[in-house]
């Protein structure tokens, strides 16, 4: 059996070699326009031409090649037909099937469908024998989509078609890469209220960024202080203060660097300096003139109290002692000077 098969293959190869021989030197004169009375050009010494033209059918010639022809060209300079063969061609179709070609070129035959049948190959509707439920099950089975709805997108495994691509068991309302979080929350928010800004942990959304336990009315980085930053002991509302209390203004009723005192009415006005400036604990109101003198002084204006007399005596004694010490020091200095003069003249 093997020898017979090899013999048949050898015969087929020889036949193919004979039929696929191409003329190397074509007859240019044979294709040229000549008069009808001219003689026919002599035949060439070619076995293939002799075999083809040996019979009476000179008007028709048929050639068979091993490879299919991909391109047919004409060389007008040589008056020849140029054939380009396709070595790795498709498998020959012995019969053209227009339905198969239409199915192959169908738009519904999408690329990268693995294990699924084409829509054209499905049985027509109404051919299912049974109820509507069985018909739907047969349709899904025929689609061969592994128990999934054909409306799902490509490469979706057991997920709801409403979900976006690459979502595994998550709600489609959630954004991409959100794991078990509320879709109202922003990206990368873990257990926080969606009204809060980014990177806010347990704070109300009314507060500004980086505020810890403070009211939103306070400015940035204010810890338990009033609205007016760096104002100590003053009213927190500038708009509610009187114009007399403008900070860092000199020559106004609100005296700068005054502690516990009220503003005088004539502070640095008309070139007059107030006596209470930079004085601590002094009353602004001057002492009222005494309308009634002391009773002890009304009767005897010349008499003094015993305390005044004692103080006067003490001051007098102190002055006398100081005068005596001063006189003694002057006398000692005079004596020393006279002794030095005597010694100088004695020498």
From Swiss-Prot:
Region (Disordered): 283-347
Tyrosine amide, modified sites: 146
Molecular-function GO terms, alphabetical: neuropeptide receptor binding; receptor ligand activity
Lipid biosynthesis found in the keyword field: no
Biased composition (Basic and acidic residues): 305-320
Chief location: secreted
Annotated propeptide span(s): 23-102, 235-240, 283-347
Keywords recorded for this protein, A-Z: Amidation, Cleavage on pair of basic residues, Neuropeptide, Repeat, Secreted, Signal
Cellular component, GO, one term: extracellular space
GO biological process: adult locomotory behavior; behavioral defense response; larval locomotory behavior; negative regulation of heart contraction; negative regulation of heart rate; neuropeptide signaling pathway; positive regulation of cytosolic calcium ion concentration; positive regulation of neuromuscular synaptic transmission
Serine amide modifications at: 270
Comp. bias regions, Polar residues: 321-347
Modification type Phenylalanine amide: residues: 114, 157, 168, 179, 190, 201, 212, 223, 232, 250, 259, 280
Highest taxon listed in the record's lineage: Eukaryota
Compartment(s) of residence: Secreted
Any matching Pfam family: FARP
Residue ranges crossing the lipid bilayer per the database entry: none
Signal peptide: 1-22
PTM: This precursor includes 13 peptides that have FMRF or related sequences at their C-termini, and other putative neuropeptides.
Main function: In insects, FMRFamide and related peptides have modulatory actions at skeletal neuromuscular junctions, and peptides that are immunologically related to FMRFamide are released into the circulation from neurohemal organs.
Family per similarity comment: Belongs to the FARP (FMRFamide related peptide) family.
Protein name: FMRFamide-related peptides
Organism: Drosophila melanogaster
Gene this protein is translated from: FMRFa
């Amino acid at each position: 059996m093997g020898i017979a098969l090899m013999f048949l293959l050898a015969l087929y190869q020889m036949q193919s070699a004979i039929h696929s021989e191409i003329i190397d030197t074509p007859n240019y004169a044979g294709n040229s326009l000549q008069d009808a009375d001219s003689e026919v050009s002599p035949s060439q010494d070619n076995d293939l031409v002799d075999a083809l033209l040996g019979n009476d059918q000179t008007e028709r010639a048929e050639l068979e090649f091993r490879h299919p022809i991909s391109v047919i060209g004409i060389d007008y300079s040589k008056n020849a037909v140029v054939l380009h063969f396709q070595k790795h061609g498709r498998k020959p179709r012995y019969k053209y099937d227009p339905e198969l070609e239409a199915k192959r070129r169908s738009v519904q035959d999408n690329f990268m469908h693995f294990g699924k049948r084409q829509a054209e190959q499905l049985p027509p509707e109404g051919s299912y024998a049974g109820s509507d439920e069985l018909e739907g099950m047969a349709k899904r089975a025929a689609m061969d989509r592994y128990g999934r709805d054909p409306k799902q997108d490509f490469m979706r495994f057991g997920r709801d078609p409403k979900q976006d691509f690459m979502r595994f068991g998550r709600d489609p309302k959630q954004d991409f890469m959100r794991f078990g979080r509320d879709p109202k929350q922003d990206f990368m928010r873990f257990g926080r209220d969606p009204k809060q800004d980014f990177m806010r942990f347990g704070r109300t959304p009314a507060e500004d960024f980086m505020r810890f336990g403070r009211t939103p009315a306070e400015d940035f980085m204010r810890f338990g202080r009033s609205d007016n930053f760096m104002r100590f002991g003053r009213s927190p509302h500038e708009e509610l203060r009187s114009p007399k209390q403008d900070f860092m203004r000199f020559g106004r009723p609100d005296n700068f660097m005054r502690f516990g005192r009220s503003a005088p009415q004539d502070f640095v006005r008309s070139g007059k300096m107030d006596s209470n400036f930079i004085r601590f604990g002094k009353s602004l109101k001057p002492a009222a003139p005494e309308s009634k003198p002391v009773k002890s002084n009304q009767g005897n204006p010349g008499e003094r109290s015993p305390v005044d007399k004692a103080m006067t005596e003490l001051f007098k004694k102190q002055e006398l002692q100081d005068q005596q010490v001063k006189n003694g020091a002057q006398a000692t200095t005079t004596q020393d000077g006279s002794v030095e003069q005597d010694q100088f003249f004695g020498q």
